[in-house]
């Protein structure tokens, strides 16, 4: 971000979504080189930004084409990529829930204890530990 004597505030709010439907399970928690991200099923959430990004929260919500499709228990991994390697920085547990017209589908939000500030040229990625249906 540009040097300034005033506090840093987001210039433009940023909201990004990513579907993990029809995604193959990631089987590693190890730092992963750029060339191996696709093979490890680690998927980009946010593109690089010249000014960096402030991430206040990450929400994981079940989605399906059927309102009563059950959630599969799994872990969603959040990865920070520094331009050469992605590092697992957070794991979000997803519990099995069978929603209905009166029961809400699974949703949870991770709020970092302090906002996650990605430096310029960093990206955020995600993965899942279970192969998900379409």
Model-found features: residue ranges?
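Surface-exposed, low-hydrophobicity beta-strand/loop segments enriched in small/polar/acidic residues
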Residues: 2-134
């Amino acid at each position: 971000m540009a040097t300034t004597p005033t506090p840093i505030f987001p210039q433009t709010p940023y909201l990004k979504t990513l579907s993990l439907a029809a995604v193959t399970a990631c089987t590693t928690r190890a730092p992963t080189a750029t060339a191996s991200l696709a093979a490890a099923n680690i998927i980009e959430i946010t593109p690089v930004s010249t000014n960096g990004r402030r991430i206040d929260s990450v929400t994981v919500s079940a989605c399906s084409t059927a309102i009563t499709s059950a959630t599969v228990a799994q872990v969603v991994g959040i990865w920070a990529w520094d331009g050469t390697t992605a590092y697992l920085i957070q794991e979000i547990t997803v519990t099995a829930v069978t929603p209905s017209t009166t029961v809400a589908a699974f949703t949870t939000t991770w709020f970092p204890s302090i906002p996650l500030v990605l430096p310029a040229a960093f990206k955020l990625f995600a993965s899942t530990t279970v192969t998900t249906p379409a």
